[in-house]
Amino acid sequence: MSLFGTNTTSQTPAGGGLFGTTTSQSAQTGSLFGTATSQPQQTGGLFGSTATQTPSSQLQSTGLFGSTTATSQPQQTGGLFGSTTTTTSQPQQTGGLFGATATSQPQSTGGLFGNTTTTSQPAQTVGLFGTTTQPQPAQSGGLFGSATQQKPATGGLFGSTTTNTGAGLFGNTSNTIGGGGLFGQTAKPATGGLFGQSTTQPQQQQNATPGLTMGQSTNTQQQVVPGVRIDLSNIKSTTRFNDLTEALQQEIAKIDEEIQKCIRDKEAVDAFLPAHGEQLAAIPTDVNFVTRKSEGAHNALSSDILAIDQLRELVKQDADNARLSFKAIDNLKLPMQYHQAGLWSKQMGGAGTAGASGASADADGQSNADLISYFSKTADEMEEMMKKFEKTITEIEAHLTGVEAHAMAMQNVAAQSRNAAQGGVDERVYELAAVLREFEESILKVAGVVGGVKEGVTELQLRDFMGHGS
């Protein structure tokens, strides 16, 4: 080392052999103004032999104004098949008067098949104004995602520490624990894996390293920002149900309940339709049956209406005939001098009639009907009925004649059989009983016919006679 830092020692790069020979670098001392000394780059062997960097055992001293001699670690590369490359820790470095110390960590890469590369971070001593800058190396995992772990580091006086962490190729988690500075400005971006596995970062414990601040320590806690509820105007296709407002969640829940209710109703209708279809198939037959019954009831009602009209007219005629009959009977009961004049005429006598006839006029003001025509018509109807009765009696007599002839024929047959066979007394008794039985049956038949005729005559007298007497 010279007074103005002109003493510079450089080591030529040493290339690793085919199977990874080792190259060692001796310790270098800085100059008064901190002239930098660089170390050679180390390369690993073809099949992953270990390339070892020897540490600088000598404590490096800074210049008068804190221009620290910067020592750069060479880039370490792993072997072809992932043999481990180990980089030893840096020697402890002391800051200058104004703390302008800069230290750079080398970049370390894993092997082809993901062997772990571990880099140790030395403890850094901050300067007076805490301007120490410590960039962390970008750690890359192996081909199959072996984890890379970064050692904790402490910030400077004003906390300008930056930590970067990289994940593995297939997304294995890389964890970084970093200590904040005095004011807690810690940035820790983390990237996910190649196939989307999440990178988990634990909550940082802000343990400030006390600097030149009268021994007081400042702790900064991480602020937790609550989730923002999304209303209907800001909803998107990627919005989760739990991110919505409570009122909107309740409305969606109600809509879902209504949809489920409709689904249950639809299932109930589907279960009801088969049996209901069978019932509907029987409706045409029932309709035809009810139609026939309705038509029959309508025809019956029409017949009843006609019958009622006829009965009403018949009752009216019977009432008129009864009134005339009663009037005629009352007139006949009186002596000859009290008989009403003009009773048997079509109209009641006019002004020339007797006062008695005028006094005996109908109280209701109705005129007398033509009793002669009435009784003449009734007599003609009775004559027709008598002719019917005579015809019926003639038929009965003819039937009785036939019965008598049959009885005589049977009697003759019986006599002939008696004379021819000369049978015993028992046979004659049997024949006589048979003849009497047949005769009795014939008499009963004739009596039935006569009874029917008598009933018909009585019915005509009670109904037809009164019905045709108008």
Swiss-Prot record:
Superkingdom of the source species: Eukaryota
Species of the source: Chaetomium thermophilum (strain DSM 1495 / CBS 144.50 / IMI 039719)
UniProt GO MF annotations: nuclear localization sequence binding; structural constituent of nuclear pore
Compartment annotation: Nucleus, Nuclear pore complex; Nucleus membrane
Encoding gene, per UniProt annotation: NUP49
Pfam families: Nucleoporin_FG (PF13634), Nup49_C (PF21121)
Name recorded for this polypeptide: Nucleoporin NUP49
Family membership: Belongs to the nucleoporin GLFG family.
Source species taxonomy: Eukaryota, Fungi, Dikarya, Ascomycota, Pezizomycotina
Role played: Functions as a component of the nuclear pore complex (NPC). NPC components, collectively referred to as nucleoporins (NUPs), can play the role of both NPC structural components and of docking or interaction partners for transiently associated nuclear transport factors. Active directional transport is assured by both, a Phe-Gly (FG) repeat affinity gradient for these transport factors across the NPC and a transport cofactor concentration gradient across the nuclear envelope (GSP1 and GSP2 GTPases associated predominantly with GTP in the nucleus, with GDP in the cytoplasm).
GO biological process: mRNA transport; protein transport
Coiled coil: 239-270, 375-401
